[in-house]
Amino acid sequence: MEFEELYRETQKRSLASQQKMNLILEETSIGNGYQKLAIPKGIQLQSNQSITFDKAGGNSSLASVRFQTRKEVVRYQLYLGNGKIKRIQEAKN
């Protein structure tokens, strides 16, 4: 499972349960209280963060998440309100 899949799964759970849910991003893992994803060695999360999904499944808290490896930076642009996500890959200089 990847970040995008866990993001969408958390979004679906919040919509199905009609309850707010949090996706917690920490140095070594990402979790939503039901599922947990280990961040592989060699990938760094820019900072510990929490994404809150409202009961309609929309992201109501955070605009971007950034991961980096030795070779590239992967940034996720999270659109507030509608819960859409866009992946942007950039080579490191």
Please place each PLM-identified region on the residue numbering.
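N-terminal helix-rich module
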Residues: 5, 12-93
